[in-house]
Swiss-Prot record:
SUPFAM superfamilies: Flavoproteins. This is Uncharacterized NAD(P)H oxidoreductase HI_1544. Pfam families: Flavodoxin_2. InterPro entries: Flavodoxin_fold (IPR003680), Flavoprotein-like_sf (IPR029039), NAD(P)H_dehydrogenase_qn (IPR051545). Its EC number is 1.6.99.-. It comes from the Bacteria. GO terms for molecular function: NAD(P)H dehydrogenase (quinone) activity. Gene3D superfamilies: 3.40.50.360. One of its GO terms (cellular component) is cytosol. Keywords: Oxidoreductase.
Length: 202
């Protein structure tokens, strides 16, 4: 079984998000799962979708670096995104990754005038760090907006259903004990996903 972890944070070594991603990688390896770890900043991923690339994608011509990401996604049974929420959206490098990688003909197609998602039979989870208070976000409905637009809205469009996500808030205010509890929650949720997927493959 294959697990694709996509991590986006400029502090690739010491960020809280990296600690979450590392723990998820560890729990996956402990389950005998093959892990593809994509650290977008460490890769120096180019997030700019050029006009030429957009036109080529519509004609089925894909750059080599994007084809590699396509291969990782196609092989993945579980896809995990770990990133900070900045200005109510993805970090620019992750947004650019999705712009370039979720291309027409790969992530979706047009059939009888309608878009059809092509990334079926895949599980996804997202762990999102925020500097603000999660309860305040929920009070204003931000969590629902994120779910409708960036999470299930975006990935349902590509054929991935029931995307689960967890917001980890107040990350600059909480102590190490609280951070460790959040990391272990991410590990527990990942373990539950892996257990269910491994059982399906028996």
């Amino acid at each position: 079984m294959n697990h694709l972890i996509i991590f986006a944070h400029p502090n690739s070594v010491r960020s809280f998000g990296r600690a979450i991603a590392n723990r998820i990688e560890q729990i996956s390896q402990e389950n005998g799962v093959n892990v593809f770890f994509r650290d977008l900043y460490e890769m120096n991923f180019n997030p700019i979708l050029s006009h030429e690339e957009l036109q080529n994608a519509n004609n089925g011509i894909i750059p080599e670096d994007i084809q590699q990401e396509h291969d990782f996604i196609l092989q993945a049974d579980l896809i995990t995104l770990v990133y900070p929420l900045w200005w109510m959206g993805f970090p620019a490098i992750l947004k650019g990754y999705l712009d370039r990688v979720l291309s027409h003909g790969f992530a979706y197609k047009t059939e009888n005038g309608e878009s059809v998602g092509l990334l079926k039979n895949k599980q996804m989870q997202q762990f999102i760090t925020i500097g603000s208070n999660v309860d305040k976000y929920k009070e204003f409905g931000v969590d629902k907006s994120l779910n409708h637009c960036l999470i299930n809205g975006l990935f349902n469009y590509c054929g991935i259903e029931n995307v689960e996500f967890e917001l980890f808030g107040d990350i600059h205010l909480i102590d190490d004990k609280a951070r460790k509890a959040m990391i272990e929650l991410a590990a527990q949720k990942t373990q539950a996903k892996l257990t269910a997927l491994l059982k399906e493959k028996e």
